[in-house]
């Protein structure tokens, strides 16, 4: 079984990868993975060994999990990260071809010294919304079901992310996964009043631009879609 005390600390304190002083934040619903108890135990152990940071370095963290192929040659693209890289590159007016995306994932995505960060609304890695394995690994009562977990964790995580954004005031926060729009609007503190013709929402609140996009793993989504998101962010810098 997992160390439930450490697991609960992780649920309250871990938010993702990169630096929250970055001007571009990506926030998703939850991280993929979490297919075995051993993987989760390694996630917790490495997090504890590094001082239980709220934000980790994505490369160091995944190297410790045995997933270093995402950060060394030949770079293995991670499907979600690849499109977030494409957004970031396009937002800076840089090429977003395959080689550029691989280089960005390898060197510039979610690092402690990077200009972006990757956060998750829900802290526990899971292979999908239809899978919930934690009752097999933990005695925490609220983890006995996914619904119980969400009921317990979502309100506090929404509050924490909202407060962090208000304190740090990043230039742009990109929420990906439009089916979670209600949660994203709760964090932004505003409805997404404009829907861009390219299919994403935008609103500006207290100096921060908030975008809501399709999930990179959504069926039928194209590279051009995420390129257009990045170009839109770039256009906001000129306003």
Predicted stretch roles:
Residues 1-168, 216-219:
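A polyanion-binding, active-site-adjacent surface
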Residues 13-16, 60, 175, 199-201, ...:
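Intrinsically disordered, low-complexity N-terminal regions enriched in serine/proline/glycine
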Residues 58, 75, 101, 153, ...:
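Extended aliphatic helical segments
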Residues 27-28, 165, 169-184:
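Glycine-rich anion-binding loop/nest that anchors nucleotide
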Residues 22, 169-171, 204-209:
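A short helix->loop->beta-strand "cap" motif at the edges of active sites that frequently abuts
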């Amino acid at each position: 079984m997992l160390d439930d005390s450490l697991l609960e600390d992780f649920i309250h304190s871990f938010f993702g990868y990169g630096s929250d002083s970055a001007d571009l934040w990506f926030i998703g619903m939850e991280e993929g993975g979490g297919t075995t108890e051993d993987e989760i135990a390694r996630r917790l152990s490495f997090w504890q060994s590094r001082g239980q940071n709220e934000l980790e370095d994505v490369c160091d963290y995944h190297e410790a999990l045995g997933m270093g192929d995402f950060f060394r040659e030949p770079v293995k693209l991670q499907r979600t990260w690849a499109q977030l890289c494409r957004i970031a590159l396009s937002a800076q007016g840089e090429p977003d071809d395959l080689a550029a995306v691989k280089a960005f994932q390898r060197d510039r995505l979610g690092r402690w010294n990077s200009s972006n960060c990757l956060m998750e609304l829900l802290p526990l890695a899971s292979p999908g919304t239809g899978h919930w394995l934690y009752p097999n690994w933990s005695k925490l009562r609220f983890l006995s079901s996914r619904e119980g977990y969400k009921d317990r964790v979502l309100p506090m995580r929404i509050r924490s992310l909202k407060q962090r954004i208000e304190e740090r005031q990043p230039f742009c926060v990109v929420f990906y996964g439009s089916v979670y729009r209600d949660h994203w609007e709760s964090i932004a503190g505003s409805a997404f009043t404009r829907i861009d013709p390219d299919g994403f929402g935008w609103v500006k609140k207290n100096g921060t631009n908030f975008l809501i996009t399709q999930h990179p793993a959504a069926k039928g989504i194209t590279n051009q879609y995420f390129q257009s998101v990045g170009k839109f962010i770039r256009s906001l810098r000129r306003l």
